[in-house]
Amino acid sequence: MGVERIKAAFENGKKAFIPYVMGGDGGLEILKERIRFLDEAGASIVEIGIPFSDPVADGPTIQRAGKRALDSGVTVKGIFQALIEVREEVQIPFVLMTYLNPVLAFGKERFIENCMEAGVDGIIVPDLPYEEQDIIAPLLREANIALIPLVTVTSPIERIKKITSESEGFVYAVTVAGVTGVRQNFKDEIHSYLEKVKSHTHLPVVAGFGISTKEHVEEMVTICDGVVVGSKVIELLENEKREEICEFIQATKQKEEA
């Protein structure tokens, strides 16, 4: 399915709620169970983190989750095996969030072959500069897996246009300067930034980094096509407050166009 499965998540004015889970945090059975829960709860896409020892874009909550996964001996191969098993039960799109190092250490061809076997539909690589994306982009295109671009508040408009013109899936618009994590509010310029990104791409635009309340979700999906919620979802899963995740999903759905 690949790119098509991601496209379907945004069809007919649908707003996407994209929760992030760390692969192997709590064990691989927990990963599969969490994906099943998020699918049943109505999440649009699930973003699965590949744990890495030097996660430069991650805030403290996601760093801790990654460390727990690594400390428990979870491997990239193990995560792929868990995804292969749970893919038989769910149709929700899978997007991997991975740093470049684990891809190269695993072997990029082997990594992408495993993505195909596991039914992965897209990949986000936060430390892969646009200028160097040919390291993996041609292989991903051949496999029909979207390389999801990230743009930031400080990205010049010409760069945003260039990055998004050759991309697939959706555009991940980083809404804060700095790392991931819970924020209290967003500055007014974020609204104009998101509108600017939307006006210069044919792809859906999804806001991420720092989104942690239902009010944030409602605010963001009035401007763009969806939200990624990472640190807050990890906290809620850890504290068994799953009903709050369901409330986030409902807040997203209520903003869908008629």
Curated annotation (Swiss-Prot):
Provide the active-site residues from the annotation: E47, D58
Which domain of life does the protein's organism represent?
A: Bacteria
**Pathway(s) this gene product operates in, as recorded in its UniProt entry:** Amino-acid biosynthesis; L-tryptophan biosynthesis; L-tryptophan from chorismate: step 5/5
Q: What keywords tag this UniProt record?
A: Amino-acid biosynthesis, Aromatic amino acid biosynthesis, Lyase, Tryptophan biosynthesis
Q: Name one GO cellular component term.
A: cytosol
Report the EC number(s), separated by commas if there are several.
4.2.1.20
Q: What class of enzyme is it?
A: lyase
Read off the InterPro entries from this record: Aldolase_TIM, RibuloseP-bd_barrel, Trp_synthase_alpha_AS, Trp_synthase_suA
Q: Which GO terms describe its molecular function?
A: tryptophan synthase activity
What PROSITE patterns is this protein classified in?
TRP_SYNTHASE_ALPHA
Catalytic reaction(s) noted: (1S,2R)-1-C-(indol-3-yl)glycerol 3-phosphate + L-serine = D-glyceraldehyde 3-phosphate + L-tryptophan + H2O
Subunit details: Tetramer of two alpha and two beta chains.
Q: What does this protein do?
A: The alpha subunit is responsible for the aldol cleavage of indoleglycerol phosphate to indole and glyceraldehyde 3-phosphate.
Q: Describe the family membership recorded for this protein in Swiss-Prot or TrEMBL.
A: Belongs to the TrpA family.
**PANTHER family referenced in this protein's UniProt entry, alphabetically:** TRYPTOPHAN SYNTHASE ALPHA CHAIN, CHLOROPLASTIC, TRYPTOPHAN SYNTHASE, ALPHA CHAIN
Name under which the protein is recorded: Tryptophan synthase alpha chain
